[in-house]
């Protein structure tokens, strides 16, 4: 696991379990490998919101509803007195490598604050006791309580996933 992530978890007293597994690149593969339901496997998405980057976490069995996420972002920006974003799209691998230094594409950890980025978490995770998220490595995942997202700085909950 990335030392920066490990330090963040420990400094914030976040309880986690490292789960070792075969090499996986997607949240769906992670669910199959760990023999868990796809709704328990977190899919980390890096998006470009106009000129800013944000991180979103949704269940593996869902797709991102960009319009709903855009509304969530704009609601937050309005509360903070900022202008609304006009466009939201997935970041390219090149952008991810440049902005999220040390992160591996396909294994980005959903703790945006580590890179000074805002994290948006689909609130459907709050129904679960534990979820499995990226650790920053293709060979391991983190088992955590989704309740921690309610306490993290620069983390916002919303409904922005849709059925595949």
Spans of model-derived segments:
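Extended, low-hydrophobicity, polar/charged segments
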Residues: 1-164
């Amino acid at each position: 696991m990335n030392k920066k992530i490990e330090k963040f978890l420990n400094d914030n007293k976040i309880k986690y379990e490292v789960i070792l597994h075969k090499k996986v690149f997607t949240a769906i593969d992670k669910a199959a490998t760990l023999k868990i339901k796809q709704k328990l496997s977190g899919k980390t998405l890096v998006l470009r919101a106009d000129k800013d980057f944000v991180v979103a976490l949704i269940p593996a069995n869902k797709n991102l509803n960009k319009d709903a996420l855009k509304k969530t972002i704009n609601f937050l920006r309005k509360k903070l007195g900022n202008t609304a974003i006009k466009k939201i799209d997935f970041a390219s691998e090149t952008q991810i490598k440049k902005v999220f230094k040390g992160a591996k594409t396909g294994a980005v950890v959903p703790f945006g604050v580590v890179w000074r980025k805002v994290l948006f978490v689909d609130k459907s995770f709050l129904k679960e006791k534990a979820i499995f998220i990226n650790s920053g490595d293709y060979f391991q995942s983190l088992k955590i309580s989704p309740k921690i997202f309610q306490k993290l700085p620069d983390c916002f909950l919303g409904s922005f996933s849709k059925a595949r």
